[in-house]
């Protein structure tokens, strides 16, 4: 059990992503990597976090923090399939166990279930809302559909309008796939023109296999040659996509529109932690807890072989600071193949997410990122711009000055 005298190994934030409704969702996006996690809990009729589980997690999670700020991240599936009363209960528990710490909440939703009531709740309690939307209607509706195959874009846009109406802070997470990657500027301008100031791109890279329990996606531990899902973006598409958007952003939107990968690139150029595990030297600092208390190494590693335990039997500290998770964290760097170790852009990329590192490098060593070619194209392309922005920051000048320089050249 946790107590006031417990000591964490080091002073840094502890992050756990919560799945209060498990993998349940009102959409059936064709590329979704999480829907099939329901197969892991086939013997559980209702994948809903109990009030008892919510309270135990809230207490332990806050007590485990060594920093004055605590971030609760609600994810899915679709977390709005839980009622507002569930989240009101969550807020009451956070207040009960806060003990002077600052509590923040962020929720990631597909946006289709947003109502005035939800948006009033988010506004009153200062929640950040992440919206999953894949750009203009044609690209979004290509993959993001209902279980009946119906489009979802119009409902998402209605949800965004409600967020704006109630002045809820929101950002966007956009999946880049084989279809929309061919239209980078139209894709980027859609978000910018809709007032989205913070934008995250997530490239789809999934391999298809078969498991006895019905799951079809491969984990990193499955090192056989496995075909890619049709929605997967190619390395060439990914590189061209990033370079094309960057060229537009660096001339018009620096300091106005914040694109996660561009921010992370500049952070690594400066030699500071980028804040996103994929572009950090090590990962494993952001676990995930399912509805029943099962804790896994990462949201992209919810596979039996990466299960750390259950909160009913072990503390969060024991699981997330334990040797199994520490080994998982170190492996991101120690498992890099020779080609990565020799690469002049390794400091910026750090091999990206381990889930995508299933190729062999030019020396025949395993562990090369499938998207390596695209990332190298991007980092090589942005290098002179990053060098300039780094110099501006070191001189305590805004990196947005680069827009004036490019305008005058």
What are these language model-derived features?
Residues 16-19, 71-77, 104-109, 259-261:
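Extended hydrophobic secondary-structure segments that form protein cores and membrane-embedded regions
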Residues 58-73, 82-220:
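Radical SAM/AdoMet-radical enzyme domain recognition
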Residues 146-154, 161, 165-278, 282, ...:
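Radical SAM enzyme [4Fe-4S]-AdoMet core and its adjacent flexible, acidic
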Residues 302-409:
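Flexible mid-to-C-terminal extensions adjoining Fe-S/redox cofactors in radical SAM and related proteins
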Residues 10-52:
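Canonical Radical SAM [4Fe-4S] cluster-binding loop centered on the CxxxCxxC motif
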Residues 21-28, 78-81, 283, 340-342, ...:
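Cysteine-centered iron-sulfur cluster-binding motifs in ferredoxin-type domains/subunits
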Residues 1-11, 189:
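Long, charge-rich, low-complexity alpha-helical segments
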